[in-house]
Regions:
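Protease-domain processing segments flanking chymotrypsin-fold serine proteases, especially trypsin-like
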Residues: 1-68, 81-88, 193
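Conserved H-D interstitial segment of serine endopeptidase catalytic domains
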Residues: 29-30, 49, 67-70, 75-111, ...
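Chymotrypsin/trypsin-fold serine protease catalytic domain
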Residues: 19-21, 98, 103, 118-124, ...
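Short Gly/Pro-enriched turn/cap motifs at secondary-structure boundaries
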Residues: 37-39, 50-52, 109-113, 163, ...
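Active-site-proximal beta-strand/loop segments in catalytic clefts of secreted hydrolases
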Residues: 49-53, 62-64, 70-73, 86-88, ...
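C-terminal subregion of chymotrypsin/trypsin-like serine protease catalytic domains
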Residues: 2-13, 17-18, 61-72, 82-83, ...
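Extracellular/periplasmic catalytic domains that process cell-envelope and extracellular macromolecules
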Residues: 38-42, 61, 76-78, 92, ...
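Acidic glycine-/aspartate-rich tracts in secreted/extracellular proteins
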Residues: 72-77, 87-92, 124-129, 156-160, ...
């Protein structure tokens, strides 16, 4: 079955509302499947995006005052409802917690097909230290070779319908060809890139949405959507940071 990443559910729980299934696309459940515990000092760009104090998505630091996440993580919610936690391997304690000051969603974001799935967050100036630092953006027009591993991190659930882990998780998954991803889903746009194993078993999947996909020292993708969780034949789909429209939008909001 298509997964809904539990973003709507997590947000609803934090405000006591019943979530509506608005999306035609299967949003990634945002969990790390087949991964292991990670130390924030090894992934200092990782943020927990919190909605009324509860973890709802991942995000990535790209400067002292900017972070990026998925548009579907912030769509429909007020800026004042969001904070981020930086510099902690634990999603509920430690590090720096700051109020999000501004949310800039890509103007062409399409919730129904999950295209242009990127938001830039403006933050108070973060103090870079051990466990808090920026990740470089993949250059516009750059291409990652098929088979190159992407490093996915976050606090998403470890099993379908399970509770969120307290400790940061990480997994590596290889890039697959656009043709393979197109054959799996039938409708992949140039703003999307796909990673996964043909046999399944490892994946991003409830709470990791908006989080980083890092390869060769660059932020190459943003956790976006997919079918199932680590399901054979269905790679995870990520917003492609090197796409010209995505890359220009992010840089125009720095």
């Amino acid at each position: 079955m298509f997964r809904l990443l539990l973003v709507s559910a997590l947000v609803a729980l934090s405000i006591g509302a019943v979530p509506k299934e608005r999306s035609r696309r299967p949003l990634l459940d945002g969990r790390i499947v087949g991964g292991e515990n990670a130390d924030i000092e090894d992934f200092p760009y990782q943020l927990s995006l919190q909605h009324y104090g509860s973890h709802t998505c991942g995000a990535s630091i790209i400067s002292t005052t900017r972070a990026v996440t998925a548009a579907h993580c912030t769509d429909g919610s007020s800026t004042s409802s969001f904070t981020v936690r930086a510099g902690s391997s634990k999603r509920e304690q430690g590090g720096q917690v700051v109020q999000v000051q501004e949310v800039n969603i890509h103007p062409d974001f399409d919730y129904w097909i999950i295209d242009y799935d990127v938001s830039v967050l403006r933050l108070p100036k973060l103090t870079f230290e051990s466990g808090i630092n920026a990740i470089a953006l993949h250059p516009i027009g750059a291409e990652l070779a098929v088979g190159t591993n992407g490093i996915i991190s976050g606090w998403g659930t470890l099993a379908s319908g399970g509770s969120l882990p307290d400790h940061l998780q990480v997994v590596e998954v290889p890039k697959v060809s656009d043709d393979y991803c197109q054959s799996a889903y039938g409708s992949i746009t140039p703003r999307m890139t796909c990673h996964g194993y043909e046999e399944g078993g490892k994946d991003s999947c409830q709470g990791d949405s908006g989080g980083p996909n890092v390869a060769e020292g660059y932020l190459v993708g943003i956790v976006s959507w997919g079918r199932g969780c680590a399901s054979a034949g269905y790679p995870g789909v990520y917003t492609k940071v090197a796409d010209r429209e995505i890359g220009k939008f992010i840089r125009s909001n720095l």
